[in-house]
A protein has these predicted regions:
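Bacterial N-terminal signal peptides
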Residues: 63-74
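Boundary at the C-terminal end of the N-terminal hydrophobic targeting segment
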Residues: 74, 78-80
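Beta-rich carbohydrate-recognition and catalytic domains
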Residues: 80-97, 102-152, 160-353, 361-390
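Positively charged n-region of N-terminal signal peptides that target proteins for export
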Residues: 56-60
Length: 390
């Protein structure tokens, strides 16, 4: 086999690249834009890592780089994370939980479920989706309350569609005196003129392929299409959509031990990564990797249990995992991935009891994290800020 080495800093003469048209391509490919050196060279930012053969002719080097043979993400723990603040931003319901966070048109939007309890115990105790808005992350105001008569709404997520709309995805379940009767995910869209969300609409799938509960989890948009997983009983499926409402099957995922909650993340070369919670066996989470058309997958055991998992790509090229930390006492924790794709705890957020389901937004060198916790009483919504070292 060929030996490879990581080159964290690589200086390339700028003038030949500009003359040949390569320079603009490299500016697009590098994680950080190239910057000019005093000697007329182009140097990638300090976080850019290239995987190149130890012995290679320049022509082959350019060809391989342009073909995308470099590290899409750095599978090593993130740079030091410093917790700079945490505050409770909502506690007006007996139970507020399951958060999502997005930066949309310069404002921060935080969504979550509010209800009387984690699961409806009596008829009429169905959950609603509350959305807060903030310009700076300091002061938060109520923006919307989305509800559906006779349906318990939960597990909300906000995303921006390819045509620029703000979309709310949420699960919708029917209960009678605490007994689950069935469920299907719903979507709602923000009207740009009225600044109100539409009534929740059930998603549409082929019922012959998904005859049971249709639970869509965390859509991630990539180009003109959105990808998500549907979990039902002990089966996990990858689906895609072009409008957020109609979903087609991509593949059945060969992931055992009752997989369910799944976060998705795309790499710069169309790689797709899955972070999957599992419920039986060892019940440890797994990490999946694939390339188009996303029908063949490689899986790695993370070595930890997951609860309400989410993913975030950091500016230094590392991947951050947010999940419930299941030790003697539960907490909401932030994890990195090492070279063997095992999770490593980096930071524990102020939390405890019924907690987790974080949302992530990166602004500059600050990571904003929404999550819920019951360490100060009933389950409430919190916002943490973490400084990212570059």
């Amino acid at each position: 086999g060929r030996n490879y080495r990581f080159v964290p800093q690589m200086i390339i003469p700028k003038k030949p690249l500009q003359n040949s048209g390569f320079f603009n391509i490299f500016r697009y490919l590098w994680l950080n834009p190239a910057r000019s050196g005093n000697d007329g060279s182009a140097r990638p930012g300090k976080s850019a890592l290239f995987l190149i053969p130890t012995v290679m002719k320049p022509a082959r080097l350019f060809g391989m780089l342009l073909a995308g043979v470099f590290a899409a993400f750095t599978f090593s723990p993130a740079s030091a994370l410093e917790l700079t603040g945490t505050r409770r931003i909502w506690d007006q319901a007996p139970h507020s939980a399951f958060t999502g966070l997005i930066d949309y048109e310069g404002k921060l939007y935080c969504c979550f479920r509010e209800a009387k309890s984690h699961v409806p115990q009596l008829t009429g105790e169905d959950g609603k989706i509350r959305i807060l808005v903030s310009d700076t992350g300091e002061a938060w105001e109520p923006f919307a309350l989305v509800e559906s008569q006779g349906t318990d709404l939960r597990d909300p997520q906000l995303s921006r569609t390819p045509d620029g709309r703000l979309m709310l995805l949420m699960g919708g379940s029917r209960y009678e005196n605490g007994q689950f009767l069935g469920g299907i995910s719903h979507v709602s869209f923000l009207n740009s003129r009225s600044r109100t969300f539409s009534a929740p609409i059930p998603i549409e799938v082929d019922k012959t392929l998904f005859p049971n509960k249709i639970w869509l989890w965390k859509i991630t948009w990539h180009g003109p299409e959105g990808y998500a997983t549907i979990y039902e009983n002990d089966r996990l499926s990858l689906v895609k959509t072009s409008d957020g409402l109609h979903y087609d099957l991509v593949t059945r995922l060969r992931c055992d031990s009752m997989p369910n909650e799944t976060a998705l993340l795309f790499g710069p070369n169309d790689e797709l990564y899955l972070l999957v919670r599992r419920e039986i066996g060892g019940a440890t989470g797994v990490w999946g990797e694939s390339r188009p058309p996303y029908t063949e997958w490689e899986w790695n055991d993370l070595g930890i249990r997951l609860g309400g998992p989410n993913l975030c790509a950091l500016p230094d090229g590392s991947i951050l995992i947010g999940s419930r930390e299941v030790q003697k006492e539960p907490h909401c924790g932030l994890y990195g991935l090492d070279g063997s794709k095992r999770a490593e705890l980096l930071l524990r957020l102020p939390s405890g009891g019924d907690c987790s389901y974080p949302g992530f937004v990166v602004r500059g060198n600050t990571l904003w994290i929404s999550y819920y916790s019951s360490h100060e009483g009933h389950a409430a919504i919190y916002l943490a800020t973490v400084r990212l070292d570059r």
